[in-house]
Amino acid sequence: MISNKRKEIDTINEHHEKNNDDSDGIDNGLLTYKKFKKDFESGSTNYRELQIIAKSLGLASNGKKQLVYNRIEGYFLSKKVKNNLTNNETNRQVEKKKEQQQPQPQEKQYILTFKDVEPVEIYFWKIFRNIVIFKHIFSNFKSKQYSYYDLIGCDEILLNGKSNSMEIIIDNIKSYNHQIIRNESNIIDIINKFKKNDEKTRSFYNLLFSRYSSTSTSPSTQLPSTIQFDGNIDIWIQRMIENVNYTALDQFIKFFKIDSEVIKKAIKIHIDPSFFGNTTYDKLKIYNYLKSINSIPTSHTLLSTISINFSTLLSFDNKFKKLIKSYKRLIESTNLQEQQEQLEKQGIIKIHPNKKYYEKLNQKILELNEIQTSQFTNYQLNSTIKKLLNHTTPTSTSTSTSTSTSTYTSTSTSTSTSLKTTNLTIISTESNYSSTNNNNNNINLKEIIKKYYKSIYLFIYFTINSANKTIFRKPLLYYLYFKKERVDKMYEHVIKKWNGSNFDHKLFFQRIFKDIKIEKNEKFELISNVLNNKYVKTFKLKDLHIFFEAVFSSNDIELIDYFLKILKQQQLNQTPETTTFPVIGSLISDYCHFIDKKEILDFYFQNYRDECLLFNDQNQTWKRIQLGLIEHYEYLTGSIGNRCNFDIFRWFDSSKFLDRLNRTIAKPLLYYFDFRGTINFNFNFIFKGLIDSNTEDSKENSIIHFLSNAQLKHPLYVSPILESSFNRYKSKMLTFIKFLFNNISKESIETKLKVINLKTDNKNFEEINSEIVLTTTLTTTTTTTTTTTTGTTATATNLLSAKKGEDVGFFIIGQTESFNFTVSIRILLVCLYRLDRVDDIIYLFDKLPEVLFNPDYFSIFTKEHCLYGISSSYYLELFINYFIENLNNNTINYLYNCLCIASKKGYTQIFKNIISSDHNSKYLLKIRTKSNQSSLFSSKLLNDIVVKSINSLNFELSNLLIDFIDFSEKDKNTLKMKIIKSK
């Protein structure tokens, strides 16, 4: 065997000599990489043969077998890469000669030859290379118009409002556009946002550190000198720790190769010792990391300051794997076992006040050390603890659920439900289910979860002062899940141990009635005891609401039925000494918003129709029924000939108003409109509030649906409606704006603006005097806007009943061909801008300067949400140039306002372009004096422009303006000092 290998090796060497050692040995007769790898994996190549091959290739032959193999494999792969590069170049030259020799075809077909290209990418390149299609598609992108990146910078709105915010920042950094990150505050927001520990985030931070450091290769004219990570190492360590960002801290330390002593010093100076003591899951991760690189000062030892936030670290809503990690991080971070051993050696443990906790904890740690995470299935690790302990996926208990005793062990129980049962044992396969617990290899999962919780609680009891033990009371859920007592006994413990607070009452009843699997008879007994005043000394009247809510929200028909029957019996036997309970009809109506399935509605309809208000004629209760059940509710109510009452002034949940209003319009035979006593003036105010609440949920189609099927008697005042949508935190309402201005031309707007009343004697001119009425014409497409109300989609046309034309006060039911709306000039221009109709704006500027640049209107256009305030740098510069070209006593104010906005937003390039123009810079950015009357602005006005850039922390722009504008030395020094104080 070895002799054969030698022959193959000799052949390799000869081949290498002939080919300048550039071959990878793939040809016939050679020891090829493929054959070499196959022989090794099959076990036919022994250690001695590997050494011979390595020596023949000039490689080291010492070390373990796998190490020698890796060297040889690396040799083959490096040869292959080199040959591929050489061969590719040779092949390209050969192909080029062939192409020159052959006649060129008239039309060349491009074919992708890569084998690993995704199918979608192939389509992309086909489109990319088709000039006609490419231009059509990319003409829809309005990056110059919006340019939200330079408009808002890297603040919390960008970070939290855009799912691709990291990619946006990366693109801007790579293109050396540092407008996206203007100051250290932006970077702190980034550190607070991007914490995921994956390759993408790690690469992002490495890019960030490389560009914002003293060694950066970024052009000096672009890099903001105020941001350099390596200039304040200790401060950035502090910020990353306090923002609990493990990924940023880890990459920061590695990138700048920070010594552990430097980290210790930074922590000692800038981090309070109690910071890590107030333990959270992520803080433990950072603490253990710093401990692993020997960077925790002795003053910050965790054990001496530790306290635990039970509500987050040990929540039963956490995944099982998080509980395991929390336990390990807590035990590892404190060196608990080492400290225990030291105490034991010193004999201190014998007199330790918490000795009993130490012994129990030590036993639990030994038991948990025997358990490996690999023993659990992925399903178990990624399930919540509550879900695993409840045996079933949290859901409402159905009427067919068996009332046999529920089990807390892994023994499978037979129920008549089809609910998904989780595996409660550790098993050797990946199955999520188990039907037996007799196998010795199976371990009860509930007991393991309990051990983890128990160990953490014992750890706390062992490490804290005995006087503070009452602070670390085990949470109520731990008691409910792990104590094997009857429900009535559990409730007594709630009263005694947890003082029976409202929160504990609510938690107890919700878990007992809805989540925890307990024998149904015990739940019945608890209901009976509460209603029979067994707990009268502890159960207060204010707790009744909590109790009723828990019963009705369970959506368990058996439970609700039993509750209502006992309550009815109590009311029949009621005496002055007993608790007075609400009548059944009121209770059902008050808690009907908890109904989440049709069966509950049917139950009330069949058994309590006459007692409750739910199905009465012209009732208001229907508004509380969940939208997903409203169609079934309508069917039940209509089946007995009753109608629902729609009273706009008694509506309490405006976020659901439009969906319900559209239903009433669609089914006027089932709903009765009660708009009596209202006046038309109030409708705009009411409708604005309803629109505001619906824009947050992006329900613009609901708004359009209503306006398409209700003939308004008076123009709709849209300015305040759209005003609220211009807030950066809200939806832009582009769909609604397109709907309004769909068929309104610039000529029709011009006509309306011409007749506007420009005369006013009011010095404090109000915007209400600058409004116009426009008419929207609805097309067939518009009037059939789809809306989703009950889970099924239908068009507005199909939803309408045959009964149309009903006058309901504010409007007349029925499809409308057009409607009028009132809009202010300021909002009009903003809407045109949003619709990318800037050419129309310029058209109106040219046609109606006396209207749009009227001095009385100037205050309107200094607001934040005006045309110039929302413009991107591209369009703001366009407006600035327009005012320069059309300069007069009116436009000069608008020009100055735009320059102030550009300064505040840090649009540095606008000012660079002005400076580069000798003509513009002389009268825009030079001080107007007696000797220089060609300049437009005084020293104070130009000073204010600079101050706005300083206040916005745009120091690059500030320095640019200070250096160029001819301020006095005193004014320059004052401005520079202001920059220093702002840093």
From Swiss-Prot:
Coiled coil: none
Disordered, as annotated region: 1-26, 391-413
Source organism, top-level taxon: Eukaryota
Amino acid composition bias (Low complexity), ranges on this chain: 392-413
GO molecular function (one): DNA binding
InterPro entries found in the cross-reference section: SAP_dom, UPF0746_actin_org
Segments forming domain SAP: 42-76
Comp. bias intervals (Basic and acidic residues): 1-21
Keywords on record: DNA-binding
Family in the record: Belongs to the UPF0746 family.
Protein name: UPF0746 protein DDB_G0280809
